[in-house]
């Protein structure tokens, strides 16, 4: 064994298996790229991203931890969102929530 080595089960690992997925169309209406990380409360993302924020409340991107999605100026794309789990209390970010979801 090598320090830090990970032994995973054989076969494909499915992230967030069984969680409901919400797909939203997101458009960057700004003049600069915007990048959103995997665990950012999507409803509180950059105000220049245009999408249904109410549908995104309590959700984050359905992408591997530590990764992000980048939106170039003028770009529009679909993104998969999944609900936060656990106590579902969101603090920080743009400070628009700060309460249980």
Curated annotation (Swiss-Prot):
Q: What cellular-component terms does GO give this entry?
A: urease complex
- Which InterPro entries does this entry report, sorted A to Z? Urease_beta-like (IPR002019), Urease_betasu_sf (IPR036461), Urease_subunit (IPR050069)
Report the top EC class in one word.
Answer: hydrolase
Q: One Pfam family of this protein, by short name?
A: Urease_beta
Enumerate the CDD domains for this protein: Urease_beta (cd00407)
| Record-listed E.C. numbers | 3.5.1.5
Sample GO molecular function, one term: urease activity
Principal place of residence: cytoplasm
Please name the NCBIfam families in this protein's record: PRK13203.1, urease_beta
The similarity comment for this entry is: Belongs to the urease beta subunit family.
In its UniProt entry, what is this protein called?
Urease subunit beta
Q: Where does this protein come from, organism-wise? A: Granulibacter bethesdensis (strain ATCC BAA-1260 / CGDNIH1)
């Amino acid at each position: 064994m090598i320090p830090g080595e990970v032994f995973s089960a054989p076969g494909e690992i499915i992230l967030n298996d069984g969680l409901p997925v919400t797909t939203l169309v997101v458009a960057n209406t700004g003049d600069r790229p915007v990048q959103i990380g995997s665990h950012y409360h999507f409803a509180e993302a950059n105000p220049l991203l245009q999408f249904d924020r109410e549908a995104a409340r309590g959700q984050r991107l359905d992408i591997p931890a530590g990764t992000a999605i980048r939106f170039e100026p003028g770009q529009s794309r679909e993104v998969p969102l999944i609900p936060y789990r656990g106590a579902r209390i969101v603090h920080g970010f743009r400070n628009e929530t700060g309460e249980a979801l």
